[in-house]
Amino acid sequence: MEILTGDSITTCLSPLVHDLICNLGFELTEICDINSIVTQNGEVRWKAITDRVSYAELGHSLDYRQSVQRLGPVCEAIHLHISSLSRAQFETQYSPWYQWTTSPELFLEIYDALESSQSAAISLSVMKLASCLERALGDVFLLIGNECPFLLRDLLASAELAHVFGHAVMDVLKVFIGSPCGLNLRNVLWHGFASPQDIPPKYCSALLLLTAGLGQLLKSYLHHTKVQLAHRPFVTLTNLEDVIVFPGVTDKVLSALETVMTKSSFLLKIMLPYWELAVSKFKSHRFADCTMLLLSQLEAGLRRVFATVNKCPDRLLTAESTILYTTFDEILAKHMSDGSINQLPCFLGEPAMDFLWDFLNYQEGPRIRDRLSHGEINIREFPKAAASQLLTFCLVLLLRFTEEDTLSELKEEAAIQLLVSLAERYRSRCHPAFQLQKQVLSCEKSLRMWPVLPLPEECCQEAGRSEGNSEACACNSLISKILCELCHYLPASACAINGLDGLPSEKWSQLLNELCNTRIPTLFCPKIVLEVLVVLRGISSQCQRVSDQVIASLQLRHRQWVEHTLRSRQRQNYVRMLSSVGLLCPVLSLILLLLALELVSVHAVHGKDAQERQQYLRFLKLILQYTENLVAYTSRQKNKWNEAVSLTRAVLLRIWTFSEKKQMLIHLTKNTNKVDTG
């Protein structure tokens, strides 16, 4: 493993950004009277603050540098004012004005951090305040607007917020957190550029007071407009259970991380206080705080690796306002901004990249960074499991960037080796391919319920006679022929399936499990592969709906049969249902097998030309249409069981024709006619 060398870096802020944040606001030495900024009962005098904002001579564009310079003394006065208050005084004077954010207790914690004078804690406070403020401002936006902007800078620039708070007030916020031309405190911290000593505490104090001032302005607006502020519900982390692969964090793991972070070249020494605070927050069960710190420092460390392996050391620093920062978006991408291949994915390896994409990027993953940074999660209820997984992953990553002979005893411990092994075997769990595997297995489990549901013997005998009709026999024959064809592409370990006898069965379940445990390459999937996966997942979802409906109908009709509440027509329909179910179960099982096999070979779609790809997608969409119609026909409202059989025969004919022409993806699998599930 190549080791990152040379830790002489004192800041990750570019010269202009460093000057803007660390120096410019200290150049004016005037002393501001705090009474001109805030009244004795805590009301913010906004004009004293907005008058400090400067604009370009022509037009209304902000002069960010001059604004930062002129706001410096105001921030200093606010900081001294906040510092002069006891906790009780601060709570009495300002807590009522934080209620609009739904997290008033957060601002007391920020006060405590300022009192502690711990730089890392103050930086964390700015991160938390920015995300909380963004969420609260989004709620205010929705008083007037319909769709809240995703990015904070777009939210602050919106006409809706300017209408509520005034343009001048919004310009003040832009200087602090809304533009790369200003202090941009939110982004330099959340993206891991700013070290603890880079953030002057007075800016945290200023944001603390400004948020209270916004609460005062909002109260006035709500009073005059007679409207009520509604808060959007917090979101939960999607599919978090899927990405839990490491055991829970133990004291041994925490101790190991504390040791490794002082030896690993992954992190810059100027960032060490953040790592120390992250461990401390985990120990005190502040899991959201821990995760916020780890995310920003994971990005900082990976940016360092990115800059090294791609031979672009300047990318370690914040870019100037005219250039995009190097963030997770580019660090984890296939290509760099100039179009060249990003070397970091190859260097880190697919398992590590899969983990990062699962946690951060995939739409069906927890997307922890987005959720936390935009204030979408209730940080008081942030799950320990999420913090545990990220912390353990960071430990394994830091170990990779230690000298070979360093910490040799620690690396040889069984508990540590287990974590390394789990990380090295990680496979994506939030990519659409894995989610399809989950869906197929879930539906197969549902289908296994059908034969074991209680059924009246008399109705079963009638249904059995109906199953002998010509259409049902034709369907059974087609199923057998298609299965016989698919058998050539099953894993070598699978037993041959003869007709319907193996549908469904214990071996059938084992077969689908084996197919769905096949590792599918997921990183940087091409568009055509994703298009195929969308349709395959649509088919699987509809199959699940059919199964759920059939189970619910069978249970209801059986209960009505036992209770003698079935009318004559319902009884006849029940018999037709039982007859159709005997056919639909193997058909749905066949479709699940087809989905599993096509998924294993999904990358073979590249072997088709453009016309063949479109033909293949039309074939899949035909099956999708069938399953959608089946959902309608098997619903309690329609109960069109005979029509469902006719529909089934038509789709089986199309599947057989397509299969006979060797046009499915399994037919394009090279070198072998068996699926390799190793």
Swiss-Prot record:
Inactivation phenotype: RNAi-mediated knockdown of the protein, performed in utero by electroporation in lateral ventricle of 15 dpc embryos, results in a massive neuronal migration defect and in the development of heterotopic nodules along the walls of the lateral ventricles. At 20 dpc, a significant arrest of cells within the ventricular zone is observed, while, at this stage in control embryos, cells have reached the cortical plate.
Record's keyword terms, sorted: Developmental protein, Endoplasmic reticulum, Membrane, Transmembrane, Transmembrane helix
First-listed, main subcellular location of the protein, grouped into a coarse class: endoplasmic reticulum
Membrane topology note: Multi-pass membrane protein
Localisation per UniProt entry: Endoplasmic reticulum membrane
TM region(s), chain numbering: 390-410, 577-597
Biological role: May play a role in neuronal migration during embryonic development.
Protein name: Endoplasmic reticulum membrane-associated RNA degradation protein
Organism: Rattus norvegicus (Rat)
